[in-house]
Amino acid sequence: MRKLLSVIYYEYVMQLKRIATWGVLAASVVITLLDGFPSEKNLARIEFLLQPSYFIYRSLSFGALIATFGLMFLLSNRMAIDHKTGMKQLIMASPITKLQYIFGKLLGGFIYTYTVFSLFLALNTLVFYVSVPIDIALTDCLVPFSKALIINVLPVSIFISFISVALPAIVDVRLFYVLASVLFILNAASPDSADKMPFYLITSGDLKKLIWQHPKFPYINTDGIQANLLFLIGCGLISAVPLFLRRKLWRND
Amino acid sequence: MYNIELRNISKCYKNGVVALDNISFNVKNGVFGLLGHNGAGKTTLLKALVTVLKPDSGSIKVCGYDLKSQGDEVRKRIGYLPQELSMYPSLSVFDFVNYMAQIKGVYDKNQVNIALQQVEMLEFSKRKIGQLSGGMKRRVGIAQALVGNPEILVLDEPTSGLDPEERVRFRGILSRFAKDDKTIILSTHIIEDVYQVCEELAVLRKGRLFYAGASADLINHVEGKIKVIKIDNENQLFDIQKQAVVISTTYASKGLTVRIVDKNMNFPGAESVSATLEDAYVYCMGGKNDA
Amino acid sequence: MKQIKSELMILGINPILILAFLVVVFTLIAIFAGEMLNLSLIGFEVIFPFIAAIFIGEWGKIKADDNYDMIAAQGKSLISWVLYRSVTVFATVTFFVVLCMAIVFHIRSEIPLQEMILIYLSPAFMLSTLTVLCNLIFTHEHVSTLVCGMIWLLAMLSKSMLRYPMTEYIYLFIRYSGDRNGIWLINKSVIIAICAVIWTGICLVYGKKNR
């Protein structure tokens, strides 16, 4: 167990130490605030911007997609790099099991994604709370923020971290980029709507509607939420399976 | 009792290359050298020894444990430095060695400091791996192998690319480690390293074991046969090559000095010199199976 | 010609297989996707230009190439190497894209073929140019693709910026966003002109020095 925790910890630390991590975080926060900062002009342009839950809801459709796209790239060579640098041989020669190594990589990536994504939301919410021109109770911000951490950030982090760590270890990382770009463009091209949303939306699917709903459309698409959740968690978990099955990945015990 | 016992190890890669062909030898305490050309099978043999690669046939016992059935016990006792190791550039020296220590199940940070002290890297422990020189990186690589005080150290060409000062420092580290009844397997191209620290060695040639035994015995194979001849031109050199194995040729302003193994005593008048390990090795590699 | 042949050999078979795979996928989408989707616009103005940039970033590596120091130290001209490499990758991708366009046109006839080529070229050229610029700056693998990907995604997400005056002249995906004022040809020309300026800068800076 301690070996697994060590792999997770160092995987997490190594990723957080990358300048690119903070670049992606900064870029996505700036982009979100450019769109939804509660300035006079934006408040006039965006109807519900005074509501903290709407601000978080909106952040999830815009900057969050940029953040997840960046994190996906940063996670995509975590296993390939061990092969390239000779670290895999070294690790395989140590008394550590395949399960410990793979789970360590996957969970380290997951905790990293969850941290960065949470920081992204926290920073945006903090800026919103400080800058909004009316008095808002802190709990009004904390409640939707906490909801987002559980309802949205958790499944999205599983999806992004697991597919980004696992798939490039199985297929050419560049094919993975091409496939991911198609998925992200489908996400970016999908307009926001009160109707049932496509299941494949990463940060702006029906799950997001549990945080804020348009007052004119106060119903919940339960099957849409389930499909969205199933897609995110299911794809994440399924993409990890080939790693465990692939014999070439590890020494023959 | 031997610390490592290899019996009839063979490995053939999918492309048909026979990397190891029926290799058998034993290794006892001390520093054991593994010599051979590029592609002779040294790295394959070491990978098999550290359980990273499975041989097609044969058996290996390390510290009495069978590699096939007791791989975990073997891994607990081995420190390994692969031929090519870039490590994680974003981690500090301490963090990297600590990471490897924890993977090995060693959670005492003092052990990390001791390993860094052994390779004289303690003062650089906070420096990032990416900011180290090539020699320092190698020392960190050795530190991660030393951490946890393994019984057996497997080093794959650890001195390649190091300057002479670093190599001397490295030999000192090995000698200190070997003092405590430990076993070190050192694969290298550099005969000088083997000569300085190894009591025993094995020579691989094209996947086959060419020699295994004491360094002194290998030298004895050519003792009394090493001669130095001074000649005037290269035509004479070609004649010599037909009758003896040429170890080295030195060009001077007036002619050439040729160092040879005069196995059949074709040059009785030539000056005899004492044999070195390099003479014996080059003779083995250059030539005849009956050496 | 010899250098292009060498670059093609360095490129290898993997990118060709991936491109062929994409053509097959697009063909299937063209056959089975409903009429609500304008595949020609989203495919050739948005998706394939970024795929071209991914290929330039991943297979047209410059500073991230393991042999960069050797080539920079010994090559006659760094800029010609950069040009040969980037153009080879771009041309290879474009060949498959045009093939895909022909198939999509044959199946769906949404937009004339020559219009599709025009729609594709300017965003592809812009994103590829930015990737080459990143390739010349960053020594780490995948960073160029990451930077360009974020720009691409941001451009896609910032359609609302078109409300500001003049932005429609430089917006990358003008046809996909609706082209309310019918200025797409001007937009494409402006973007290509910006690319030409960037390339002139690259040639001036890297043409003089070898590293």
Feature roles, as predicted:
Chain C
Residues M1-A20:
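Aromatic- and glycine-rich beta-strand/loop motifs that create alpha-glucan
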Residues V23-I31, T94-A102, G149-S160:
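Aromatic-anchored segments of alpha-helical transmembrane domains
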Residues L28-S40:
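Short, hydrophobic transmembrane alpha-helix segments
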Residues S40-K63:
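Long, hydrophobic alpha-helical segments
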Residues G57-F90:
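Helix-loop-helix units of permease transmembrane domains in multi-pass membrane transporters
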Residues L83-S109:
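Hydrophobic alpha-helical transmembrane segments that constitute the membrane-spanning cores
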Residues E115-E141, I194-T200:
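Hydrophobic alpha-helical transmembrane segments of polytopic membrane proteins
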Residues S144-R211:
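Terminal transmembrane helical anchor/hairpin motif
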